[in-house]
Amino acid sequence: MPASIVVVGGGIGGLLTANLLAKRLDRTEATITLIDATGMHVFQPGWLYVALDQANARWLARDTRALLRREVRLVIDQALHIDVGQRRVTLARGDNVEFDYLVVATGATLARDEIPGLRETTHDFYSSAGAERLREALRGFNGTRLVVSVPPMPFKCPPAPVEFTLLADEFLRKRGVRDRTTITYVSPLDRVFPIASVADMVDGYFGRRSIETRMSFNLQRVDGDMLVSDAGEEVPFDLAVSIPPNRGAPVVMSSGLGNSRGWIPADPRTLAVRGTNGIYVVGDASDLPTSKNGSTAHFEAPRVAEQIIAAVEGRVPNPVRSRYRGLVICPFEVGGGKATVLVFDYDRAPPPLRPNRLWHAATWLFNRTYWFTVKSGRL
């Protein structure tokens, strides 16, 4: 009887894992089911460009079915509960999907309501609607005080708020309002980026572009036109771009799979969910000490696929193909038609390469070829 493999989540981690499994396993060996709440896959890195009037949100969404290999069964429904003991996923319609192997790729969710006043008063670009609203706000912004704030780690794509700040500086210069605008970057960290070598690079760009910083600022609430920290410090604004706190998906919380923030404890090398058998996590949903972004999922998916395939075929997993070492390769826009790339893993974080136009062009090429590569599993 074929093994039942279920993937929960239709983001990049879920899509890649399902397609890799379908590519290497025959239908007589396994059935592969992907459960996705909306049936639409969104290229989330593109939201940054929507906010800055460089892309259209309609370009960023595609039908999930069109991105899956035909061997993958797609179930469009909300996963409400994962029963590890009974090995089944309960859906909103009341159906149960049983599994022998499970991949949890439910991502991260935005917890806007954890900060009083955040939803009502500030903007962010971590959703299609949010990016479009921010674009309109920037179009009408005529100067004074722009503030960009980030939540405590972890949150999705840590480079994105820094990229936005640098690109917003460029955007406002082109509009002729930068000379009457102060830009302030606010973070709970003691430096502008978690990796010291990257923080040093960003400090240089911020300094040359007269971008101010407020570090060790833990946002507690938003009062009118003021960000207020837990220590009572205040940062006034006319336009605030505040990235909401992140947490795990509701299905993770309801199933007792996550920690207090909903992140799933996993083995950092195998990505197996701790305390379970045959259950893995891919992408933002885990508690691993690495970046939450598409690159992470890209490198994790083949490792999980190899382990499941080996189990189905009754062999030992290939030690090279089945072990994740924390590798992340992340493009990083700095403005002026230039970008760099961040390359790091669990053990090393070398200084970023000198920003240049080649990396910027490579970033745009990747963005445009994304849809053609995700189905093949060659992303």
Regions found by a protein language model. Give the residues of each.
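Rossmann-like dinucleotide-binding core of oxidoreductases
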Residues: 143-204, 208, 212-214, 293-310, ...
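FAD-site-proximal beta/loop scaffold in flavoenzymes
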Residues: 118-142, 234-300, 306, 310
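FAD-binding core/adjacent interface of flavoenzyme oxidoreductases
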Residues: 1-4, 72-163, 170-176, 241
